[in-house]
């Protein structure tokens, strides 16, 4: 299951004012969301769980940890216990990434992916190499973005007034089209600051198999209100057969590292 590929970014159409502004940096933070079903479906009639996100700055990059878990009630009776954990580390220059994803269903591991990816400085194609499953390699198109860079680019473009943006994204949450997608993001008008999280923008992202050029039915859809600090509110994850909603319950700012 594709569960949470964080936010989108741009490959082209940069607005001149964005180049003059300081690039976005995600605020190191930890957030906990209450998770539930966004309407009864033929797949699930109820769901109860949580979604946790942590972004921790390091001297040479940024590490993220995400976990989504819920117990879903099935139409014919019975329950589904689902738990997925996803971690990444990305270098400060946005060119290197390590990733790990493991999902559980009813307490059993059903999927696991681990590896690393790299994009070259010359703007050419990159490569992802998996240790789980062993021996799997993927070619990444030129200018493919990793998740943290993807999110920061989207914030930059929202601040510059962009309304529709698109990008190739690699997140490591699978292999093939599960990990490498073409993302189109629609950005709404900014929401005034309410607290330390700052101003925010409503966003709707559609994830397509990259080979299809983003023209067919999306594999996955994601919407949220994203702040300039990288904090999400009002999250909706649409898998097609069912959709989940997540509301921010707790937020904690984390201290930055001391780097020489």
Please give the residue ranges for each predicted region.
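Bacterial N-terminal signal peptides
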Residues: 6-15
């Amino acid at each position: 299951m594709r569960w949470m590929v964080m936010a989108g970014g741009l490959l082209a159409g940069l607005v001149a004012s964005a180049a003059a502004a300081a690039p976005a940096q995600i605020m190191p933070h930890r957030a906990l969301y209450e998770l539930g079903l966004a309407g009864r479906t033929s797949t699930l009639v109820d769901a109860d769980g949580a979604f946790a996100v942590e972004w921790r700055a390091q001297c040479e990059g940024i590490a993220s940890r995400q976990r989504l878990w819920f117990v879903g009630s099935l139409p014919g009776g019975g329950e589904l216990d689902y738990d997925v954990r996803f971690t990444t580390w990305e270098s400060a220059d946005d060119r290197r990434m390590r990733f790990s994803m493991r999902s559980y269903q009813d307490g059993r591991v059903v999927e696991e992916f681990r590896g690393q990816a790299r994009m070259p400085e010359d703007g050419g194609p990159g490569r992802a190499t998996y240790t789980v499953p062993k021996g799997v390699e993927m070619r990444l198109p030129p200018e493919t973005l990793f998740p943290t860079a993807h999110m920061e680019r989207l914030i930059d473009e929202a601040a510059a007034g962009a309304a529709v943006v698109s990008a190739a994204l690699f997140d490591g949450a699978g292999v093939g089209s599960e990990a490498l997608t073409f993302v189109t993001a629609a950005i709404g008008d900014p929401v005034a600051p309410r607290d330390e999280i700052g101003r925010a923008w409503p966003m709707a992202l559609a994830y397509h198999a990259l080979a299809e050029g983003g023209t067919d039915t999306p594999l996955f859809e994601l919407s949220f209100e994203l702040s300039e600090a990288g904090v999400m509110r009002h999250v909706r994850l649409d898998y097609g057969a069912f959709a989940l909603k997540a509301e921010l319950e707790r937020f904690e700012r984390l201290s930055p590292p001391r780097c020489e």
